[in-house]
Regions:
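Conserved small/polar residues in nucleotide/adenosyl-binding loops
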Residues: 274-280
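Iron-sulfur cluster-binding cysteine motifs and their immediate structural context
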Residues: 31-38, 57-75, 86-102
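Short glycine/proline- and charge-enriched loop/turn segments
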Residues: 262-270
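Conserved AdoMet/S-adenosylmethionine-binding subsite of the radical SAM
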Residues: 106-262
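N-terminal pre-triad scaffold of radical SAM enzymes
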Residues: 4-57, 74-83
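Glycine/small-residue-rich loop that forms an oxyanion/phosphate-binding "nest" at active or ligand-binding sites
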Residues: 71, 80, 85-90, 104, ...
Length: 282
């Protein structure tokens, strides 16, 4: 299992002060994704062109001769590159980085346990995020059970795009889900997120009917889901759920992921989206 980030002292990923573990791999491909390095389950190389000083240190250090310095910056031959990470280690300008570090459950627990004093004093815990953590049910459940044995509050930030039996197993081993509701129309959901939404909505209803705690977030994106029809359908669906706490966060669109797509060399925003103002959201 590869992890692409560990965020300490997180305060927006559940109650209290938390440590958030970002797992690589996601079955969705949302066109506005702000963590595109979390979509692939494998290691990836990120290159920040504006940091590069053209010193050729990485070119000379690469054991596979996969790098070339051009007027456009460093070009990587994907057929040669083994993602060994030497280029990132030697780069004096920090223009190269490898996204994805392989962790065992024991190693991740050591990282989590370092934060216990902050968790205890703030009634915080650990949040498993992604990517999509439910894409790795075996390692995820192992970690959730280990945290449960330590009395650590457990949250899972998930799309809920997973087999119902996986959702049930995870639900039995965590205290909180953090779930996005992106688009009620299944065809539009498939267009903008890469998969239809029937499984997601069915799993969300199952979680609600089990009276399991969850926070709901709706990213509002003009041209995707911020229209009156989708908002009305979203409200009607949520009102139909046997849901006690009813915590809904409306998230305005941002383009933080743009720079990450540039580093990965992937396409960002095939459609131009508009930033919604707070008065518009209200």
């Amino acid at each position: 299992m590869f992890v692409f980030d560990i965020k300490r002292y997180a305060i927006n990923d559940g109650p209290g002060i938390r440590i958030t573990i970002f797992m690589k791999g996601c079955p969705l491909s949302c066109v506005w994704c702000h963590n595109p390095e979390g979509i692939s389950s494998r290691k990836q190389k990120l290159y920040t062109k504006k940091k590069c000083i053209g010193c050729r240190t990485c070119v000379e250090a690469c054991p596979e001769q996969a790098l070339t310095l051009t007027p456009e910056g460093i070009v990587t031959d994907g057929a040669r590159c083994t993602l060994c990470g030497i280029c990132a280690e030697v780069c004096p300008a920090l223009a190269m980085e490898i996204s994805g570090t392989e962790y065992s459950a024991e190693a991740l627990m050591k990282e989590i346990e370092k934060e216990i004093v902050f968790m205890d004093r703030s009634e915080g815990g650990v949040t498993f995020c992604g990517g999509e953590p439910l894409l790795h049910p075996g390692p995820l459940l192992d970690l959730l059970r280990r945290c449960g044995e330590r009395g650590i509050h457990r949250a899972v930030d998930t799309t809920l795009f997973a087999r119902p039996e996986i959702v049930r197993d995870v639900m039995d081993n965590c205290e909180l889900f953090l779930v996005d509701l992106k688009q009620m129309d299944s065809a539009k959901h498939a267009k903008y997120c890469g998969v239809p939404n029937e499984l997601i909505l069915s799993n969300l209803r199952m979680v609600a009917e089990a009276r399991h705690d969850f926070y709901l977030r709706i990213p509002l994106i003009e041209g995707v889901n911020a229209d009156e029809e989708n908002i009305t359908r979203s409200a009607a669906f949520l009102a139909s759920l046997p849901w006690e706490h009813r915590i809904v966060n409306l998230l305005p669109y941002h383009d933080i992921g743009k720079s990450k797509h540039e580093k990965l060399g992937t396409v960002y925003n095939p459609v131009s989206y508009t930033h919604l103002t707070l008065p518009t959201i209200a």
